[in-house]
Swiss-Prot record:
<protein>
    <recommendedName>
        <fullName>Purine-uracil permease NCS1</fullName>
    </recommendedName>
</protein>
<dbReference type="GO" id="GO:0043100">
    <property type="term" value="P:pyrimidine nucleobase salvage"/>
</dbReference>
<dbReference type="GO" id="GO:0015205">
    <property type="term" value="F:nucleobase transmembrane transporter activity"/>
</dbReference>
<feature type="transmembrane region" description="Helical">
    <location>
        <begin position="445"/>
        <end position="465"/>
    </location>
</feature>
<feature type="transmembrane region" description="Helical">
    <location>
        <begin position="218"/>
        <end position="238"/>
    </location>
</feature>
<feature type="transmembrane region" description="Helical">
    <location>
        <begin position="327"/>
        <end position="347"/>
    </location>
</feature>
<dbReference type="GO" id="GO:0009526">
    <property type="term" value="C:plastid envelope"/>
</dbReference>
<feature type="transmembrane region" description="Helical">
    <location>
        <begin position="293"/>
        <end position="313"/>
    </location>
</feature>
<feature type="transmembrane region" description="Helical">
    <location>
        <begin position="474"/>
        <end position="494"/>
    </location>
</feature>
<dbReference type="Pfam" id="PF02133">
    <property type="entry name" value="Transp_cyt_pur"/>
</dbReference>
<keyword id="KW-0934">Plastid</keyword>
<feature type="transmembrane region" description="Helical">
    <location>
        <begin position="140"/>
        <end position="160"/>
    </location>
</feature>
<feature type="transmembrane region" description="Helical">
    <location>
        <begin position="363"/>
        <end position="383"/>
    </location>
</feature>
<feature type="transmembrane region" description="Helical">
    <location>
        <begin position="525"/>
        <end position="545"/>
    </location>
</feature>
<feature type="transmembrane region" description="Helical">
    <location>
        <begin position="257"/>
        <end position="277"/>
    </location>
</feature>
<feature type="transmembrane region" description="Helical">
    <location>
        <begin position="411"/>
        <end position="433"/>
    </location>
</feature>
<comment type="function">
    <text>Nucleobase-proton symporter that facilitates the uptake of nucleobases in the cells. Can transport adenine, guanine and uracil. Contributes to uracil import into plastids for plastidic uracil salvage which is essential for plant growth and development.</text>
</comment>
Length: 599
């Protein structure tokens, strides 16, 4: 037995926040509309469906029972308030007349999602899942900011020659700049309840979305390894002195570290998986309850350095070692590195904002980023500067500093603080995005837990102990290097969502493999996005190869481009994408204007 059904939905170009639920009769003037048809076929062994845009036209109310669409007229299939205008600007029946199933406020039916493109971790969030208040979002950022890498980044700027105030100014400036793309990228996550991998489908294509999500996942795996290594160092700090002086603590040349330190790394690696396995709710609770503890422990460290150094006057007496010209030469790559520090989260922030109660909650919660970064940077810079007075040399690594302080109580507090700070940062910042990327790659096989496990395994492959061997390799090779990958992705996604699609997404088509789907493009790939991505990366490659000593001599222009990799790659990729898509849009408009609407 074979059955089929056809349903039509009108998508109006109205701002989603200007209208709540109104009847069709509330329309007062001419507006643009898109007519979509959804056709499904079902027999005893197979079910298939597709959704396509039939036509775009004007809709104008003529009377209470008569409406004009382009050159055609119609009367509502269901009278009165049975036709409603949802917040996303979709005219639809309250219930699907054909199937009897409830249609979502954004005009889609989850039962029509292609099973190869969705599972429980990829579906749009429901109202009951949206539990993140502004306080939860702020707590998330406190947990992310208060950590060893943030402290180490601030200390690295002093270590490279900056004065304390120059280091803080660099960090705060970078995070104020970052706040703009952070809030802009979070908006579709909250509005539509979709994660970063699903949002990427709108610009890169249904299958092409694997490219940006896997690149983001790769960076996340590297960061996961770095954070886990730091947590392992905290365990190493707890070990008795005679064990740390044993033969097991000798570095193996082929490994790049000692068997003892590597074992501590693996122990912490295993401990994190217990929390990761609980999913997003476990992460939210961890961040919320850890925030006050981390603030208290950070305050204790600042108080200790204040007393030991003899006050802020002595703590902050370390002046800049740079001339004016040398400072500006260091400032711009340092600014890029600091923006790159959280550029990973700026890209996949929809993974978190999709759980926010409202746009207000996500915006207010994220404004805390530059504030928290400024405060914690002050702690990091002040304590690092004080070490030159207390110990006679600058110690930018907090784990090394805590080892120098000594004492059982200090050691225990250090273990708790470093472990908690590492867990809150690592799990939220470096597990969620790679895990979701792997789920998006193969929803039938990967769950969030399985994706997190593979992320952890790849974190070992990155050999984080080598990335942390010096301030220069951490700032110039790692942070700036990966910004060349993330910058163009961010530029493409933001240009597509705000300039090309005007914040309007067809959620049903984001989960459809139909060739007529809006985001199927060419066999599931948007060639324009791929070309723009390559265009954004290529100019940075020579500078990166020079930095890792693969190229001996390059033009000074390539050095400047690499030092500002995030800005150049973001702007170039976004501009190239806008040019290509604008030209394609004009061609499509000319084709559609010569055809007749199918009504």
């Amino acid at each position: 037995m074979v059955s089929n059904c056809l349903s039509l939905s009108l998508h109006l170009n109205l701002h989603p926040h200007k209208h709540n639920r109104h009847s069709l009769s509330s329309l007062r003037s001419r507006t643009k509309a898109k007519l979509y048809q959804h056709v499904s076929f079902t027999d005893s062994s197979h079910k298939s469906s597709y959704t396509s845009c039939v036509s775009t036209f004007d809709i104008q109310r003529k009377s209470s029972k008569h409406y004009e669409l382009g050159k055609h007229s119609f009367s509502p299939i269901l009278p009165g308030d049975n036709l409603v205008l949802s917040r996303s600007g979709v005219i639809r029946p309250r219930l699907s007349a054909m199937t009897g199933s409830e249609i979502n406020d954004h005009g889609y039916d989850e039962s029509q999602f292609d099973p190869s493109l969705t599972n429980d971790d990829l579906k749009p969030t429901t109202p009951s899942q949206r539990t993140f208040s502004w306080l939860d979002m702020s707590s998330l950022w406190i947990g992310l900011v208060v950590g060893v890498p943030t402290y180490y980044l601030a200390g690295s700027l002093v270590d490279l020659g900056m004065a304390w105030w120059q280091g803080i100014a660099t960090v705060v400036t970078a995070n104020l700049i970052l706040l703009v793309p952070l809030v802009l990228t979070a908006q579709p996550g909250t509005l539509y309840g979709i994660s970063f991998p699903v949002l990427a489908r709108s610009s890169f294509g249904i299958r092409g979305a694997h490219i940006p999500t896997l690149l983001r996942a790769l960076v996340g795996c590297g960061w996961y390894g770095i954070e886990t290594w730091i947590g392992g160092e905290a365990i190493f700090l707890l070990l008795p002195g005679h064990i740390k002086k044993s033969a097991l603590s000798h570095t193996l040349p082929w490994l790049g570290t000692s068997p003892l330190e590597f074992s501590c790394f693996i122990v912490f690696w295993l401990a994190q998986l217990c929390i990761v396995w609980r999913g997003m709710d476990g992460i939210r609770k961890l961040e919320k309850y850890s925030a006050p503890i981390l603030i208290s422990l950070t305050s204790c460290l600042l108080a200790w350095s204040y007393l030991k150094a003899g006050g802020f006057g002595h703590m902050l007496s370390l002046s800049s070692k740079l001339t004016s010209a040398q400072f500006w030469t260091l400032f711009f790559p340092s600014l890029t590195a600091n923006i790159s520090f959280w550029a990973t989260l700026a890209l996949n922030i929809p993974d978190f904002s999709r759980f926010a109660k409202s746009q207000t909650d996500q915006i207010i919660g994220q404004v805390g980023l530059p504030v928290f970064m400024g405060l914690f940077t002050f702690v990091g810079v002040a304590v690092t500067s004080s070490t030159s007075i207390i110990f006679g040399r600058v110690i930018s690594n907090p784990i090394e500093l805590l080892g120098q302080i000594g004492g059982l109580a200090t050691t225990l507090l250090a273990i708790v603080g470093i472990s908690l700070a590492t867990l809150t940062t690592n799990i939220a910042a470096n597990v969620v995005a790679p895990a979701n990327a792997l789920v998006n790659l193969n929803p039938k096989f990967f769950t969030f837990g399985r994706g997190a496990f593979l992320t952890a395994v790849l974190g070992i492959v990155f050999q984080p102990w080598r990335l942390l061997k010096s301030s220069e390799s951490f700032v110039y090779t790692w942070l700036i290097g990966y910004s060349a990958l993330l910058g163009p992705i961010g530029g493409i996604i933001l240009v597509d969502y705000y300039l090309i699609k005007k914040m309007k997404l067809n959620i049903g088509d984001l989960y459809s493999l139909s060739p007529s789907g809006e985001y199927y493009f060419s066999k599931g790939y948007n060639v324009a996005a791929v070309v723009a991505l390559v265009a954004g990366i290529i100019p940075v490659v020579p500078g990166f190869l020079h930095k890792i000593s693969a190229l001996s001599k390059i033009s000074n222009g390539f050095v400047v481009v690499y030092d500002n990799a995030l800005f150049f790659s973001f702007i170039i990729a976004g501009f190239v994408y806008w040019i290509i898509m604008s030209r394609l849009g004009r061609k499509q408009s000319s084709l559609s204007s010569s055809s007749h609407p199918l009504l």
